[in-house]
Amino acid sequence: MDAKSNAVFWQEKWERGETGFHEPQANPLLTRHIAALDLPAGARIFVPLCGMSQDMVWLAGQGFHVTGCELSDIAVHRFFNDLDLTPDIRDVGPLRCFSAGTIRIFAGNIFDLTPDLLGLMDGIYDRAALIALPEDLRRAYAAHLLSLTGPVPELLVTLDYDQSCLKGPPFSVDEAFLRECYGQAYAFTLLESRAVEGGLKGRCPASENVWRFSPLPPSS
């Protein structure tokens, strides 16, 4: 699937209300492990492909400044509507920026987001971005994310399962892929691994893994 087809796929998901991937409260893996990033209150956290995730609300409640990027305008509008917030909205190149309080979300294709638009980030939280993308786009996404933020501490949630069992998304992402795409910039620590109760979509045994990415020191 190319980038355009992938964008159409997710836009249509939101238009049809097929949002079973949305969680109505903060993910417990986030609340258990965010401290592993060792970020102070006021730190700037990037949440790529954020949807209308309640994780952003929770992070803001912990004192962080949260920036998301989401393809679907529907998701972004619903996010702020559900919080009874009226965001400031402005066009920034091919994207639209919605902001209210310490949360802002860029609506549009993440590959159109630039470091200048994003600004400096102190950390990344990726629960549903990497695993939402087919393999070719995952590689492009990983490279783009590094170009946006540079190597900063990251909390990443992945799924690991037999990809032949399910078509995806969500897609299986194993440690070998992480090392191939991120190994030049990060050291990895597996913080937690747990079996998906009942199997993924009730069909396939799977493990959900939480990784901490720690930036490697610059080579001399």
Swiss-Prot record:
The keyword S-adenosyl-L-methionine applies. The keyword DNA damage does not apply. Keywords: Cytoplasm, Methyltransferase, S-adenosyl-L-methionine, Transferase. It catalyses: S-adenosyl-L-methionine + a thiopurine = S-adenosyl-L-homocysteine + a thiopurine S-methylether. One of its GO terms (molecular function) is thiopurine S-methyltransferase activity. PROSITE patterns: SAM_MT_TPMT. One of its GO terms (biological process) is response to metal ion. Its EC number is 2.1.1.67. It is an enzyme of class 2 (transferase). It is found in: Cytoplasm. S-adenosyl-L-methionine binds at W14, L49, E70, R127. Signal peptide: none annotated. GO terms for cellular component: cytoplasm. Coiled coil: none annotated. Belongs to the class I-like SAM-binding methyltransferase superfamily. TPMT family. NCBIfam families: PRK13255.1 (NF009732), TMPT_Se_Te (TIGR03840). This is Thiopurine S-methyltransferase. It comes from Gluconobacter oxydans (strain 621H). The gene is tpm.
